[in-house]
Amino acid sequence: GIHGIPVTMQQSVYDALAGGALSNYWTFGRDSRDASYYNRVVVGALRAVDFICSLPQYNGKALGVTGSSQGGALSVITAALDSRVTFLAAVHPALCDHEAFFKKRACGWPHYFYYYGAPDEKQLETVRYYDTANFARLLNVPGWFSWGYNDEVCPPTSMYAAYNVISSPKELHPYLETGHYWYQEQWDEWLDWIRRQLNVPM
């Protein structure tokens, strides 16, 4: 996970962290792009690419990133920042179009300004630096995207704000009635596309 914590502990450990030390972690360090919690998270994603590229199993050709929600955002960000990534697949990506709030539109998770009030200039600069839509402009690899129109966590308008600025090859597969979850056929379609990018037999 993004917190650098083993994923094999008892659920009670994660529940305690979510309600305690990691509560509202997305607000940590939001006065500075360098102190932001997401700085370490993004660097960690790039280090993961370093690790994959160091493995003898890696063919040096195809390397994809994929995820949903926060993981979808990190997929876009990682693909935008690291030229070794050759494709991405993002499902209901978060962290999109933070400033939509000021234009009376729905912004994506974590809805900074709904819950935490109007930002000062430093906070505004920081959230711009970690806005998926701003990284989407930098993409130059194929991307597969999917989301639902009933998603209240990552509203579709926020995700369209990122999708619409992508100039590289892209596919959007909306599942209109879904919220912040997947249908099985959506999962199957996502996996088939990834297999094609990797030239893996279906």
Residue ranges and their predicted role:
Residues 160-202:
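C-terminal catalytic histidine-bearing segment of alpha/beta-hydrolase fold enzymes
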Residues 138-139, 145-147, 151:
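Short beta-strand/loop motif that positions the catalytic acidic residue
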Residues 72-120, 174, 182-185:
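Hydrolase active-site cap/lid region
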Residues 141, 155-164:
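Short alpha-helix in the alpha/beta-hydrolase fold that links the catalytic acid
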Residues 1-43, 100-107:
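Cap/lid segment of the alpha/beta-hydrolase catalytic domain
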Residues 120-135:
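Active-site nucleophile elbow and catalytic-triad environment of alpha/beta-hydrolase enzymes
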Residues 24-69:
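Gly/Ser-rich "nucleophile elbow"/oxyanion-hole loop immediately N-terminal to the catalytic nucleophile
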Residues 149-154, 180-181:
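Acidic catalytic loop of the alpha/beta-hydrolase fold
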